[in-house]
């Protein structure tokens, strides 16, 4: 799959009203500027309100008598689709084809920028379960896909823009069934193109929401994330130029891809305008996300959005202010730095595409029940990146991937994971794997046998303390204290009471590392999250794995991935996840040397930038 580079598009002259206020000249100029600056893919939106303007007609006692089109027009076709809108959309596709732009079409665009755009016939209805709503959705899909499926500019069909914002759902079964129904309706009329999710804010498991990663993966061919630091949960604590913000999109996208076992596209991202950061940082933010997601195997990155919307006088632009200044182009049409930088990095990625194998992974991070799954995943990923450990994610209910190292960070509550998977995990430890567990008021069966520790007392207590490990002190916090003594475990660190807080226990051919505090969960709501040195705990606990890498660094902002081909040749990608230039001072394993530099500078990695180079084996 080609790495998708582009943006989300509404016309500069009209925004969400572009199909009603169609201006071919404005659209053509928009696309010309975008295409010459590296935009190869665009996500576009046939406004549902405009393309299927079906309205109800009532008679005596407000009884429904028939449906027609807005303005009391007779329907032009069985799908109640406005053929004028279809003609405009087809012309739009023609222009995109002229400029070499491929389209992801968000079919059921009933939600956009804080406003619902649905046909009046469906007002007040449950769009996921109501028979009338489902009927008109099926008709709309049939009408759109059959009329446009022959156009070469269309790359994929998207269920619609963030359709999980169209109303509440009673259960995950409702959400998943709706997504499968819509996706299969699309495939019924066009099975030659991928179906893209278009959703955001999905949950790893049912206990954190009805719209789940697994549900979308069951329905769609390509999953999507919309990782905005301003909007996403727990992502707005630090500056745009911070490591916490920088890893967000890569982490979330990898979480969805790993749990869903489907390609995942960063379908929308951006810095949300000049009140959050300046234009130079926005450009650097896009550069970083293109490079980082490319080397981590994402399906692509798309900016929100193409154009400024400060001159638009229609809702939602007149009702809220955050959507107005997000474009890659200014109001006068000139490119912002984010657009020109997108074009530059697009050229770099196209030169590397097909030459860089998948990144190697060191460990599996298992997310468990009852915890704040996204927050824990996010913080674990950040600590691991700083330490030099590359992780993938797994959900505790699913089949656990084979691995040499497992992490169960910040377990919470008493339902942690199904017993059958727990026993499989213990068996893998006995066969030689390493298991790391940190505790956030969680209960583990067979705790003593697993950890070599015995709990003597436990109590709820808001505790902030200091632990000592290898002569270095670290702050910790926890809400429940399990007081333990070793019954076979080696104590690596003690708390300020002198009690074991990090330990290691040999179990069969493997080992269990236990942290008696929620290292990861404690960081979720903390500002300047990764400016302190907690990552050194990971670096110490997993040092055998990390030090076995051909390339390492002590520079915490630098995340390294290694990419090995079938012949054993290695490419190293090093990304700087901060807005300060960093000297990585790479440590190269014996027998290797830095070879051809494919991108960047090995001596200094600029702000939100990277370096990619080959390793050569010494004779």
Where are these regions (language model features)?
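Active-site mouth of glycoside hydrolases
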Residues: 1-215, 220, 284
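Conserved, mostly hydrophobic/aromatic
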Residues: 7, 34, 96, 144, ...
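Glycoside hydrolase catalytic-domain groove-lining segments
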Residues: 173-177, 192-199, 203-274, 308, ...
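Short, flexible/disordered intra-domain loops and linkers
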Residues: 57-63, 168-173, 205-208, 232-244, ...
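Carbohydrate-binding surfaces of carbohydrate-active enzymes
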Residues: 258-262, 270-619
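Alpha-helical scaffolding within the catalytic cores
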Residues: 26-30, 139-145, 202-215, 246-256, ...
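Structural recognition of the beta-strand scaffold that forms the well-ordered cores
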Residues: 4-8, 41-45, 103-106, 155-159, ...
């Amino acid at each position: 799959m080609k790495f998708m580079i582009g943006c989300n598009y509404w016309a500069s002259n009209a925004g969400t009203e572009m199909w009603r206020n169609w201006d071919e000249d404005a659209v053509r100029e928009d696309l010309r500027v975008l295409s010459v600056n590296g935009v190869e893919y665009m996500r576009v939106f046939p406004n549902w309100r405009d393309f299927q303007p079906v309205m109800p007609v009532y008679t005596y006692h407000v009884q429904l008598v028939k449906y027609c089109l807005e303005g009391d027009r007779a329907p032009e076709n069985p799908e109640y689709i406005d053929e004028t809108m279809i003609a405009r959309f087809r012309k739009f596709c023609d222009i995109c084809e002229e400029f070499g732009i491929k389209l992801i079409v968000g079919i059921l665009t009933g939600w956009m920028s804080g406003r619902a755009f649905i046909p009046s016939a469906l007002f007040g209805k449950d769009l996921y379960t109501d028979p009338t709503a489902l009927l008109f959705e099926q008709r709309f899909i049939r009408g759109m896909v059959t009329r446009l499926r022959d156009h070469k500019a269309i790359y994929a069909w998207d269920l619609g823009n963030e359709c999980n914002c169209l109303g509440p759902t009673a259960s995950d079964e409702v959400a998943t069934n709706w997504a499968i129904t819509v996706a299969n309706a699309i495939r019924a009329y066009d099975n030659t193109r991928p179906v893209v999710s278009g959703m955001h804010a999905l949950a790893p498991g049912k206990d954190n929401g009805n719209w789940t990663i697994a549900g979308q993966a069951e329905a769609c061919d390509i999953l999507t994330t919309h990782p905005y630091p301003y909007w996403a949960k727990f992502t707005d604590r630090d500056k745009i130029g911070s490591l916490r913000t920088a890893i967000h999109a890569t982490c979330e996208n990898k979480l969805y891809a790993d749990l869903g076992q489907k390609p995942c596209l960063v379908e929308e991202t951006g810095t949300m305008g000049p009140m959050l950061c300046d234009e130079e940082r926005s450009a650097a933010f896009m550069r970083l996300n293109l490079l980082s997601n490319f080397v981590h195997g994402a399906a692509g990155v798309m900016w929100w959005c193409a154009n400024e919307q400060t001159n638009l006088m229609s809702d939602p632009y007149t009702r809220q202010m955050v959507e107005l200044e997000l474009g890659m182009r200014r109001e006068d049409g000139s490119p912002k730095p984010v657009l020109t930088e997108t074009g530059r990095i697009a050229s770099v990625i196209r030169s590397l595409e097909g030459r860089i194998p998948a990144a190697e992974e060191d460990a599996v991070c298992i997310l468990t029940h009852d915890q704040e799954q996204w927050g824990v995943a996010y913080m674990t990923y950040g600590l691991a990146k700083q330490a030099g450990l590359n992780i993938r994610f797994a959900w505790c209910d699913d089949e656990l991937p084979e691995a040499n190292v497992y992490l169960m960070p910040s377990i919470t509550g008493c339902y942690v994971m199904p017993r059958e998977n727990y026993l499989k995990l213990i068996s893998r430890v006995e066969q030689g794997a390493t298991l790391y567990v940190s505790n956030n008021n969680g209960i583990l069966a067979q705790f003593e046998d697993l950890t070599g520790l015995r709990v003597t007392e436990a109590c709820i207590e808001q505790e902030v303390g200091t632990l000592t490990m290898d002569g270095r002190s670290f702050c910790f916090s926890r809400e429940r204290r399990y007081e333990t003594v070793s019954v076979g475990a080696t104590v690596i660190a003690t708390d300020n009471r002198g009690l074991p807080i990090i330990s290691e226990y040999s179990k069969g051919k493997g080992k269990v590392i236990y942290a008696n505090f929620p290292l990861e969960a404690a960081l979720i709501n903390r500002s300047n999250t990764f400016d302190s040195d907690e990552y050194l705990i990971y670096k110490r606990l997993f040092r055998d794995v990390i030090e076995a890498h051909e390339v390492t660094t002590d520079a915490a902002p630098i995340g390294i991935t290694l990419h090995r081909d079938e012949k054993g040749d290695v490419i190293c990608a090093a990304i700087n996840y901060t807005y300060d230039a960093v000297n990585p001072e790479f440590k190269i394993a014996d027998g290797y040397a830095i070879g051809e530099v494919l991108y960047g500078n090995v001596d200094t990695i600029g702000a939100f930038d990277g370096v990619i180079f080959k390793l050569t084996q010494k004779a």
